[in-house]
Structure formats: structure tokens, C-alpha cells
């Protein structure tokens, strides 16, 4: 789709969206990297932390169904979600001494966070070229890395993490609110959203789900897996950083690749990700091969993510709802199931299992391609 705004407005949007992504994902970094340790430090058990962090993604999975049948993601709802995200960070702080109260506040916080990102992604896809989108989206990765490096070196008092979470949520609210005026997409209605169908392209959605299940072992156990091989935490930190550097590089230079067939790109990225997990299984104690596998994060995450949201944007008329379902099915349900499965199979064969799951994700994509071709052929014959 061609950009809908003139060059000056595109630049303004790109600038503000870059700031939104930077601070949004910096906040995600605080929430994902530091808050679990904070909860442990203030007296939560590992089981309680596990429940808290498994419940929030599941809410993100349920949220799109609410928007499909009851609510439409309008600019007003988006603005309210930004405001609530900020206010709920204070509620997290106030309820941190009580597990059940904190769990409820965390569920609401996860829901609010899950509303704003699909809204901005949809505007970005309708406003920017695929090449320009990557150069804007990479600021999210930079924000994530920046907060990890900064807070990792200065965080001495656990509760101070709440201050950073609130501050970043507020700055995200400020820049996010400025993006509303760039929303040129026709508003979806509850009636049109009800016609949205996961079953129509079920094999595609199954593939997205399985892909993130395959990432479960990496996100939750990569550090533990490598330390078990005798790799130091310092080296593991560099491994994580190297993967993000490769991710940022791909987001910046991926433009020409995205002019090709998006479904073919997804199939290629899924296959490469399976190879990545096989490398970790075959060479668990090789630092060099682990760095090679980390370089593939550029394809398995950065290229895959951009190709996915671009493909979904073309596949459905309900643009915002489709992006919400991507976040919910893949990172919500897939992330939750992936974490649980990885915990059950953790051991020497962890990444062999992840590779097999990812190969099934690739097979589902090929099935989707065949089904879509049949559907197109049948439509032409009518």
C-alpha cells in the first residue's frame, strides 16, 4: 500500500512514532527484564511470579475477541488505553505487597498495553512504506536495549523499578497521544469486526502460534541453558546484545527484501528459525556457533515480524482488529504455551523440541499457501 500522507506529515509521523516505539519498548524492557526480579526481592515466590507473568499474555489473547464483538478500537479507546497504562503503573506500585491485588492490577496493565501497540502499528503500515517502517520500528529495539543497559547498571533499590515503569509509561502516553491525528484509516464497526474470521485462514494463524511456541525455550531458558554449558553471564549478555544488534540492522536494511512475496519471506524466516534452534541443540557448548545462531535473530524476529504484520495488513479489511489478533494469538497464547512447554521439556533436547515445533509452523504456512490458492481459484470460477 502506498503512503497516504504527504512527505512532511510522513516525517512528523515517523519522528513521533519512533519516540513512541522507543519509550513503549523501554517500558516493556523494565516490565520483562527487571520486574520479575523485583517481585522476588520483595517476597514473592517463584511460583507466584510465574503465575503473574503467564496470566498477562493470556489476557492479551482474549482481548481481541472483546474488540471483535463488543468494542471498536477507535482513537478514543486508544487514548484511554494510553492513560490507563500510566495510571495502572501506580496501581502496580500500591498493590505490590498483596499477590491477588497485584495480579489483578497486572492483568489490567497487560490489557491496556495490548491495545495501543496494534493501533500504532496499523497507522504505521498505512502511512509508511515497508522500508521506512523498519527504520522507525527499530527504535523500539533500541529503547529495549537502552533501558536494559542503563537500569542494569544503576538499579540498586528494587522498588525504584516502579518509578522507571511509571515514567516511561507517561512519556509513551505523551508521544502516543500525538499520533492520533495521523489515523486516516476508515473506522471499523462492530458489525464489520464480527465478520472477521480466524477460521478462514486457520493454517496461517496456527503457524503464527507455533512459531512463538518455538520461541518459548529461547526467551525463558536461553540464559539457563547456556550457563549449564559453562558460559559466563557476561558472555551470555553479549550474546543477547549481539542478537538485538542484528535485529536492528535487519530492520534498517530490510526494505528491498519486503518488496518480494511476503508469504515466501515468512516461509524462509520460519525455516531459518528452525535451523537456529537445531544449531543450539547440536552445538550447546560452542560459543562461536551460539553467536551464529544469534545472528539469525535478524531473520527469525525482525524480518519475520515486519513481513507478518505487512501480510496481515493486506489479508484483512479489519486492519486494527487483525493486528490485535496477531499480538494475541502469537505473543499472547503462543507466548504462554511456549513458556509452559519449554518448562516441561527443559533439558538437553529443549532446542530440538523447539526446532520440531518451528518446522510444524513452516508446514502450516505451506498448507495456508495451498488453501489460499484453492480459495482464489474457486472464487475465479464462480
What do the predicted segments below correspond to?
Residues 4-57, 200-239, 305-306:
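Helix-loop boundary and gating motifs at the non-cytosolic
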Residues 57-65, 143-148, 236-258, 335:
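Transmembrane alpha-helices of Major Facilitator/SLC transporters
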Residues 61-75, 155, 249-262, 346:
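Helix-to-loop junctions at the C-terminal end of transmembrane segments
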Residues 77-91, 264-279:
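Structural signature of the two symmetry-related core transmembrane helices
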Residues 113-128, 302-316:
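Intracellular juxtamembrane helix-capping segments at the cytosolic ends
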Residues 161-178, 350-369:
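Symmetry-related core transmembrane helices of the 12-TM Major Facilitator Superfamily/SLC fold
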Residues 319-347:
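A late C-terminal transmembrane helix in Major Facilitator Superfamily
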